[in-house]
Amino acid sequence: EEQNISEDIEFDNLDHLCNHFMIYKKREAIATARVREKENHIFKIERVAVLVEHRNIKVGSLLINEIIKYYNETENKSSIILHSQVAVEKFYKSLNFVSYGENFLEDGILHIAMRHIN
């Protein structure tokens, strides 16, 4: 709802191909993301969301760092990528992601492609 993305885009029939990560607080999901293998062991973090009241207290950082840790320890990955909204690019840069390419529109929102650097 917050991003005003239509359900047709949000429910893309790819969930069954993804690993899903969640952070709970007292049985309430407060953060989530999914990761999908694109090709050649390239994993893309998608659908990152943190409830508004839990932002700016490192929940998002914890979620992304745990995802990176999981793929570093369990998968023969060549790269972890994501499409960051330009508004939060600085957040991902703080977690060792670097931007590449030009800004682009995805679902009507300005994004930049990013890659994690170990």
Q: Which sequence ranges carry the predicted segments?
A:
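Conserved acetyl-CoA-binding loop-helix of GNAT-fold acetyltransferases
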Residues: 50, 56-69
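Conserved beta-strand in the GNAT
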Residues: 22, 28-37, 41-49
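Short loop/turn motifs at secondary-structure junctions and domain boundaries
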Residues: 11-16
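Conserved GNAT acetyl-CoA-binding A-motif
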Residues: 64, 71-84
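Helix-loop element at the rim of GNAT/NAT acetyltransferase active sites that forms part
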Residues: 1-7
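Conserved catalytic-core motifs of GNAT/GCN5-like acyltransferases
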Residues: 81-83, 93, 98-113
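A conserved beta-turn-beta hairpin within the catalytic core of GNAT-like acetyltransferases
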Residues: 37-45, 55, 74-76, 105-111
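Residue-level recognition of the GNAT/N-acetyltransferase active site
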Residues: 51, 85
